[in-house]
């Protein structure tokens, strides 16, 4: 589960890792290319949002988010990272591309919650990936980090149980999850 992911077909495979990569690649390319492009075509008719036209940029942002799951990330830090590789991109473009990845359910965003002010903040969200096998595929099997992988699993389980999940800080201490269901905040 933690290495190859949780897509149902993978559980029935022998030689899981080799076959899983091919299977996950097919899912990823289908979602990235077909689903996001179709969603953008529908959206183009009803909104003035920027159309996702650069699939390479979209994939680079997906790889970056996969490499930092469970860490606070800003749109500016992603734009700066991409600029460091020689490509200039605006923060608005990065924001639109992240939105496309979350609308396609490849990533989920956990917004920061001000514990004292009891309100959502729009900076330094954490992103979690839909499946750890997909993360392994995107990162070419490097840097298996148990802590962030477990945090990703807990996040997805909290969502599955119907909680709204945020992240926060109290003083200098990070709060991994602030969960809300109905009027109850834990």
Where are these regions (language model features)?
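Short beta-strand or tight-loop elements
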Residues: 161, 173-175
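Interdomain hinge/linker elements that couple catalytic modules in large macromolecular machines
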Residues: 1-156, 164-165, 169-171
